[in-house]
């Protein structure tokens, strides 16, 4: 919770079931009984004086996999919750009408201190959106409201910010 984060001896950000990630779940195609808890994740990279941070709440209809190995990390469980089953295959098997259109939005932000213009930030967000497709399956369904934003904290017009070409 917020008090745990505030009283922590670490400079690392608190992640998981906190803030917007509190109610986040994945693998919800068969309802919450077979879904799995997810949450909020944060990752930062430094390049010289520049920092790029991604913060994402994973609240997807689909399964979550490691983008390098394809190993499922979280998602739809079988009815006795002993193993994972494919959310994508289940979606195709059970195309019967059901209310899947609420509670499935993975939302994120890419934040940097480098000076990017609006078009460049839009491109950064577009590239970051591709990460969803590498890790969430299925992604971008009619039942998902996935989105990602990009923003810069660089000041404009005072000569402090350095422009970075992408």
Residue ranges and their predicted role:
Residues 1-166:
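A structural signal for small-residue-enriched, beta-sheet-centric alpha/beta enzyme cores
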């Amino acid at each position: 919770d917020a008090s745990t984060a505030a009283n922590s001896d670490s400079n690392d950000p608190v992640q998981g079931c906190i803030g917007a990630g509190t109610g986040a779940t994945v693998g919800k195609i068969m309802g919450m009984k077979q879904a799995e808890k997810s949450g909020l994740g944060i990752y930062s990279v430094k390049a010289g004086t520049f920092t790029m941070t991604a913060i994402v709440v994973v609240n997807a209809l689909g399964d979550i996999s490691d983008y390098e190995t394809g190993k499922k990390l979280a998602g739809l469980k079988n009815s006795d919750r002993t193993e994972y089953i494919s959310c994508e295959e289940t979606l195709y098997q059970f195309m019967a009408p059901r209310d899947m259109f609420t509670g499935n939005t993975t939302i994120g932000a890419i934040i940097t201190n480098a000076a990017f213009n609006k078009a460049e930030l839009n491109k950064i967000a577009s590239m970051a959106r591709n990460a969803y497709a590498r890790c969430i399956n299925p992604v971008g369904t009619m039942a998902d409201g996935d989105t990602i934003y990009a923003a810069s904290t660089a000041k404009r017009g005072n000569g402090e910010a350095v422009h970075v070409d992408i």
